[in-house]
């Protein structure tokens, strides 16, 4: 595995445009026990999918392993076939309201899918070392926050510079 190639793929996919870069992160607002607002943020399932695809030689599987009427349990296994390192992660999600009423069948499916996605993300991020991806993740975050140029903007700037020299997009494509 060539780490430079992996990191370049992650950066290319995740910074295609600002919207894609934004999809690589999640932010949740929650109240703590004292009623104070807390912000929870991290890498999204989309970023985990991009990292897993770029990493290569990786097998990831998710499945629902339990539904006891109160919670759904999802499990994900991620196996790096090059290093033979594997991780199994489980995620529980409640399927009852605050008053104890069980979610509809439809909402249980949605909750199960969400739990599977979270388990997938957790397993992938446990197998692929953060030390390897930290730098590129920071670059993606800059694009998401509008502090860096995404691939599409970079392409437009490049074409504009060529146009100043009399080179058209058609000429570039033909070349």
What do the PLM-derived regions correspond to, one by one?
Residues 1-72, 77-175:
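Polyanion-binding surfaces on beta-sheet-dominated domains and ring/shell assemblies
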